[in-house]
Protein backbone atom coordinates (compact mmCIF):
# COMPACT_ATOMS: atom_id res chain seq x y z
CA UNK A 1 0.00 0.00 0.00
CA UNK A 2 2.71 2.43 1.03
CA UNK A 3 5.55 1.25 -1.22
CA UNK A 4 9.21 0.86 -0.22
CA UNK A 5 10.63 2.92 2.60
CA UNK A 6 13.03 5.61 1.38
CA UNK A 7 15.87 6.88 3.54
CA UNK A 8 15.66 10.62 4.17
CA UNK A 9 18.83 12.44 3.14
CA UNK A 10 20.56 14.10 6.09
CA UNK A 11 21.63 17.72 6.22
CA UNK A 12 25.27 16.63 6.35
CA UNK A 13 24.82 14.60 3.15
CA UNK A 14 23.22 17.57 1.37
CA UNK A 15 26.17 19.74 2.39
CA UNK A 16 28.60 17.09 1.14
CA UNK A 17 26.71 16.92 -2.18
CA UNK A 18 27.01 20.75 -2.46
CA UNK A 19 23.24 21.26 -2.38
CA UNK A 20 23.68 23.32 0.81
CA UNK A 21 26.44 25.65 1.95
CA UNK A 22 29.29 24.32 4.09
CA UNK A 23 28.31 24.93 7.68
CA UNK A 24 30.27 25.33 10.92
CA UNK A 25 29.05 25.98 14.46
CA UNK A 26 31.14 28.11 16.81
CA UNK A 27 29.85 27.70 20.35
CA UNK A 28 30.80 30.61 22.58
CA UNK A 29 30.36 30.01 26.31
CA UNK A 30 30.37 33.29 28.21
CA UNK A 31 31.81 32.88 31.70
CA UNK A 32 30.04 35.24 34.08
CA UNK A 33 31.56 36.66 37.26
CA UNK A 34 31.30 34.85 40.60
CA UNK A 35 29.17 37.72 41.85
CA UNK A 36 26.61 37.17 39.10
CA UNK A 37 26.76 33.39 39.45
CA UNK A 38 25.93 33.72 43.14
CA UNK A 39 23.19 36.22 42.33
CA UNK A 40 21.49 33.88 39.82
CA UNK A 41 22.04 30.51 41.52
CA UNK A 42 18.39 30.12 42.62
CA UNK A 43 16.79 31.97 39.71
CA UNK A 44 13.79 30.50 37.92
CA UNK A 45 14.17 29.95 34.18
CA UNK A 46 12.12 33.01 33.20
CA UNK A 47 14.13 35.22 35.55
CA UNK A 48 17.44 33.82 34.33
CA UNK A 49 16.68 34.34 30.65
CA UNK A 50 15.36 37.85 31.30
CA UNK A 51 18.54 38.71 33.19
CA UNK A 52 20.69 37.27 30.39
CA UNK A 53 19.07 39.11 27.49
CA UNK A 54 19.08 42.41 29.39
CA UNK A 55 22.74 42.10 30.41
CA UNK A 56 24.46 45.11 28.80
CA UNK A 57 27.91 43.49 28.79
CA UNK A 58 26.55 40.42 26.98
CA UNK A 59 24.73 42.61 24.45
CA UNK A 60 27.91 44.62 23.89
CA UNK A 61 29.74 41.36 23.18
CA UNK A 62 27.08 40.44 20.60
CA UNK A 63 27.41 43.85 18.98
CA UNK A 64 31.21 43.67 18.75
CA UNK A 65 31.04 40.12 17.39
CA UNK A 66 28.54 41.06 14.67
CA UNK A 67 30.50 44.14 13.63
CA UNK A 68 33.68 42.06 13.30
CA UNK A 69 32.20 39.49 10.91
CA UNK A 70 32.46 39.59 7.12
CA UNK A 71 29.39 39.10 4.95
CA UNK A 72 25.75 39.31 6.00
CA UNK A 73 24.92 38.53 9.63
CA UNK A 74 21.57 37.48 11.09
CA UNK A 75 21.11 38.08 14.84
CA UNK A 76 18.15 36.15 16.25
CA UNK A 77 16.36 37.16 19.46
CA UNK A 78 13.18 36.05 21.27
CA UNK A 79 11.91 39.08 23.18
CA UNK A 80 11.06 42.22 21.20
CA UNK A 81 11.02 44.97 23.83
CA UNK A 82 13.50 43.43 26.27
CA UNK A 83 16.09 42.38 23.69
CA UNK A 84 15.40 43.14 20.02
CA UNK A 85 14.72 46.84 20.50
CA UNK A 86 17.64 47.11 22.92
CA UNK A 87 20.03 45.59 20.38
CA UNK A 88 18.65 47.82 17.63
CA UNK A 89 19.31 50.92 19.70
CA UNK A 90 22.75 49.70 20.79
CA UNK A 91 23.93 49.13 17.20
CA UNK A 92 22.74 52.48 15.90
CA UNK A 93 23.96 53.06 12.33
CA UNK A 94 27.59 51.96 11.91
CA UNK A 95 29.30 53.47 8.85
CA UNK A 96 30.30 50.24 7.11
CA UNK A 97 27.15 48.18 7.78
CA UNK A 98 23.54 48.29 6.61
CA UNK A 99 21.32 47.76 9.68
CA UNK A 100 17.90 46.10 9.30
CA UNK A 101 15.36 45.12 11.95
CA UNK A 102 12.48 42.62 11.73
CA UNK A 103 9.94 41.48 14.30
CA UNK A 104 6.34 40.26 14.15
CA UNK A 105 5.04 43.81 13.76
CA UNK A 106 6.89 44.34 10.46
CA UNK A 107 4.49 43.81 7.54
CA UNK A 108 5.08 41.64 4.48
CA UNK A 109 6.08 44.50 2.21
CA UNK A 110 8.85 45.64 4.56
CA UNK A 111 10.03 42.05 5.02
CA UNK A 112 10.38 41.82 1.25
CA UNK A 113 12.44 45.03 1.31
CA UNK A 114 14.72 43.39 3.89
CA UNK A 115 15.13 40.36 1.64
CA UNK A 116 15.99 42.47 -1.42
CA UNK A 117 18.59 44.52 0.47
CA UNK A 118 20.24 41.41 1.96
CA UNK A 119 20.32 39.55 -1.36
CA UNK A 120 22.01 42.45 -3.14
CA UNK A 121 24.59 43.44 -0.47
CA UNK A 122 27.29 41.72 1.58
CA UNK A 123 27.57 44.10 4.54
CA UNK A 124 24.13 43.73 6.13
CA UNK A 125 23.29 43.05 9.79
CA UNK A 126 19.71 41.88 10.34
CA UNK A 127 18.37 41.91 13.90
CA UNK A 128 15.32 39.65 13.79
CA UNK A 129 12.92 37.82 16.08
CA UNK A 130 13.47 34.07 15.80
CA UNK A 131 9.74 33.37 15.52
CA UNK A 132 9.37 35.68 12.53
CA UNK A 133 12.57 34.71 10.76
CA UNK A 134 12.51 30.95 11.31
CA UNK A 135 9.64 30.61 8.82
CA UNK A 136 8.60 34.02 7.50
CA UNK A 137 11.55 35.39 5.52
CA UNK A 138 13.54 33.61 2.82
CA UNK A 139 17.06 35.00 2.35
CA UNK A 140 19.82 32.90 0.81
CA UNK A 141 22.62 35.42 1.21
CA UNK A 142 23.24 34.89 4.95
CA UNK A 143 26.86 34.17 5.91
CA UNK A 144 26.63 34.31 9.72
CA UNK A 145 23.90 33.56 12.25
CA UNK A 146 24.15 34.61 15.89
CA UNK A 147 21.86 32.94 18.43
CA UNK A 148 21.46 35.92 20.78
CA UNK A 149 18.71 34.27 22.87
CA UNK A 150 19.02 30.76 24.29
CA UNK A 151 16.53 28.11 23.12
CA UNK A 152 16.30 24.33 23.33
CA UNK A 153 13.54 23.87 20.72
CA UNK A 154 14.87 21.41 18.14
CA UNK A 155 12.46 22.57 15.43
CA UNK A 156 13.14 26.27 15.91
CA UNK A 157 16.90 25.76 16.11
CA UNK A 158 16.97 23.73 12.89
CA UNK A 159 14.69 26.23 11.15
CA UNK A 160 17.05 29.02 12.19
CA UNK A 161 20.10 27.06 11.04
CA UNK A 162 18.33 26.56 7.71
CA UNK A 163 18.54 30.31 7.14
CA UNK A 164 22.29 29.96 6.73
CA UNK A 165 22.41 26.68 4.83
CA UNK A 166 20.98 27.92 1.55
CA UNK A 167 23.57 28.37 -1.17
CA UNK A 168 23.71 31.56 -3.20
CA UNK A 169 26.00 32.96 -5.85
CA UNK A 170 29.30 33.81 -4.21
CA UNK A 171 28.36 32.17 -0.89
CA UNK A 172 29.86 28.76 -0.17
CA UNK A 173 30.08 28.76 3.62
CA UNK A 174 27.99 29.78 6.63
CA UNK A 175 28.81 29.97 10.33
CA UNK A 176 26.51 29.77 13.34
CA UNK A 177 27.63 31.53 16.52
CA UNK A 178 25.77 29.88 19.39
CA UNK A 179 26.14 32.04 22.48
CA UNK A 180 25.70 30.26 25.81
CA UNK A 181 25.98 31.54 29.37
CA UNK A 182 27.76 29.79 32.22
CA UNK A 183 26.16 30.98 35.44
CA UNK A 184 26.82 27.73 37.27
CA UNK A 185 27.47 27.96 40.99
CA UNK A 186 29.26 25.06 42.69
CA UNK A 187 27.18 21.92 41.91
CA UNK A 188 24.28 23.92 40.46
CA UNK A 189 24.11 24.20 36.66
CA UNK A 190 22.00 27.07 35.32
CA UNK A 191 18.93 26.49 33.13
CA UNK A 192 20.15 28.01 29.87
CA UNK A 193 23.47 26.17 30.06
CA UNK A 194 21.46 22.93 30.16
CA UNK A 195 19.58 24.13 27.08
CA UNK A 196 22.91 24.75 25.37
CA UNK A 197 23.82 21.13 26.05
CA UNK A 198 20.57 20.12 24.32
CA UNK A 199 21.56 22.20 21.29
CA UNK A 200 24.94 20.46 21.27
CA UNK A 201 23.11 17.14 20.95
CA UNK A 202 21.25 18.54 17.92
CA UNK A 203 24.52 19.57 16.27
CA UNK A 204 25.93 16.12 16.96
CA UNK A 205 22.91 14.27 15.56
CA UNK A 206 22.94 16.49 12.44
CA UNK A 207 26.72 15.96 12.07
CA UNK A 208 27.44 19.69 12.11
CA UNK A 209 31.14 20.36 12.80
CA UNK A 210 31.52 22.55 15.87
CA UNK A 211 34.12 24.14 18.10
CA UNK A 212 33.68 25.43 21.64
CA UNK A 213 35.22 28.71 22.80
CA UNK A 214 35.18 29.89 26.41
CA UNK A 215 35.29 33.64 26.99
CA UNK A 216 35.37 35.56 30.27
CA UNK A 217 32.65 38.19 29.98
CA UNK A 218 34.10 41.55 30.95
CA UNK A 219 32.03 43.64 33.33
Where are these regions (language model features)?
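Long, largely alpha-helical accessory region at the distal end of helicase-like NTP-driven motors
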Residues: 68, 72, 207-219
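Conserved interdomain hinge at the start of the Helicase C-terminal
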Residues: 35-93
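Inter-lobe connector of SF1/SF2 helicase motors
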Residues: 23-39
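Conserved RecA-like helicase motor-core motifs
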Residues: 74, 92-113
Amino acid sequence: IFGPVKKVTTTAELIEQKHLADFTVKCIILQHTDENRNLMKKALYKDEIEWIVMNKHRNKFIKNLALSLKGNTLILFQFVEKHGKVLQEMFGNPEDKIMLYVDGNVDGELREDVRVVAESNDNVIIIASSGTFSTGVNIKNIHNIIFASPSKSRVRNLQSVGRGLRRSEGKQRATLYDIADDLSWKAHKNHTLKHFEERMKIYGSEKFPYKIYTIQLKE
